[in-house]
């Protein structure tokens, strides 16, 4: 069973997602604090703090703290602190603090604080 910070199972995790596919604080499909599809603090499709499609703190399509399409702190295509394609603090495809595909603080595919197969504490530092 995979759970997020609050203990929800993977696939639908986060603080209050609507559909159960994405996760986050209150998104509709994706994850994040209030996005519509993607994840992040308030994006429309992608993830991040306020982007339109991508992810990051304020980008339009890409992700990161302010980019237009690219990414934030160090990724290759996506954005975030170190991802390869997606966005987030260290993911490989998705976004979040350490996920592999989805978004959130530690998930592998989904999103939220710890979905995929790890708990919040485990995923915060490294996801399984």
UniProtKB/Swiss-Prot annotation:
Disulfide bonds: none annotated. It comes from the Eukaryota. One of its GO terms (cellular component) is intermediate filament. The keyword Cell division does not apply. One of its GO terms (biological process) is post-embryonic camera-type eye development. Keywords: Keratin, Repeat. Induction: Expression in skin and hair follicle is regulated by HOXC13 and by GATA3. Strong expression in narrowly defined pattern restricted to the lower and middle cortical regions of the hair shaft in both developing and cycling hair. During hair follicle regression (catagen), expression levels decrease until expression is no longer detectable in follicles at resting stage (telogen). Residues 11-117 are annotated as: 51 X 2 AA repeats of G-[YCGS]. Belongs to the KRTAP type 21 family. Interacts with hair keratins. In the hair cortex, hair keratin intermediate filaments are embedded in an interfilamentous matrix, consisting of hair keratin-associated proteins (KRTAP), which are essential for the formation of a rigid and resistant hair shaft through their extensive disulfide bond cross-linking with abundant cysteine residues of hair keratins. The matrix proteins include the high-sulfur and high-glycine-tyrosine keratins. This is Keratin-associated protein 21-1. The lineage of its organism: Eukaryota, Metazoa, Chordata, Craniata, Vertebrata.
